[in-house]
Amino acid sequence: PPANSPRHCQMPAIPLRRSDMPRVFDHGARSYPLILGHEFSGVVDKVGEGVVSLSAGDHVVAAPLLPCGVCEDCLNGNYSLCSHYSFIGSRQNGAMAEYVVVPEANVVKIPNSLAMEQAATIEPATVALHAFKTSRFTAGKSVAVVGCGIIGLYAVQWARILGASEVTAIGRGQNGLDAALRVGADRAVSTSGRTEKEMQGLLGDGFDYVFECSGADATIHLAIATVAKKGTVCLIGTPKQPLSFTVSQWEAINRKECWVTGSWMSYSAPFPGEEWTDSVRCMCSGELCSDPGLVYGVYPMSQAQAAFEAIRSGAAKGRVLLTNEL
């Protein structure tokens, strides 16, 4: 392996992300051929020359971002904003293989007692925590989380861990809403069959912080409609379609003088950041968990095509994981 690059043997599991679907089915890969997989846990197989913090046999997770390290954003610790980055699983080969090469700086050790399937979901936990840091969250405030996928469920848990006064989960699918209650939401409200006005009537307009984890037109509108005056809307979800706003929807931002901020990826100084070390710590302590009720299926690597098809067809109503045998 290259200097300062440990080599990892991939262990169960490598979660499939919906963001990978365009790369597989819609010519969305940046280059071809490309091995996907940016969320993973593993066991160090070999270490490169000069590696001092890792040894063969260590259980680890790894941050997929490969920042340049020399631009102004990197020097300021804003690695997520690096314009010259590479990324494991999208800009270079990822973890859906027997081995993947990762720089030493990207690797975070985990205890052997932490299940690999659980550890493999740490990356979305770091994304959720980064949003709380970006939005300058303070304890004692009310939180709404819009969208109950994996990042939304971790946002619910971080809200509780970081001292929110109350946590409301908002979503469409009942599985996600049920999971949100299991992991710590005080209440879960379904958007199914309800207009924005009806939702606002149910929720009011008093949330101090709203974390939008879907990226859909309607959920962004709802986040703005239900945030408190002088409150904060943090946009985590990535839109897949053009967005539109009515005059009154946009004017609500002005009239409430609310703060709308984006949050991108999950890194801070020293790289990869507290987002990663805190997520590992809280997962090991049991404060943070990946709800098992949201796992649709576990597939061996030899059945990867079937796993991707389950997501594309809509059959998968939860997380899909690929596994490797050691």
Indicate residue ranges for each PLM-predicted region.
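Short, surface-exposed secondary-structure boundary micro-motifs
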Residues: 12-13, 49, 65, 79, ...
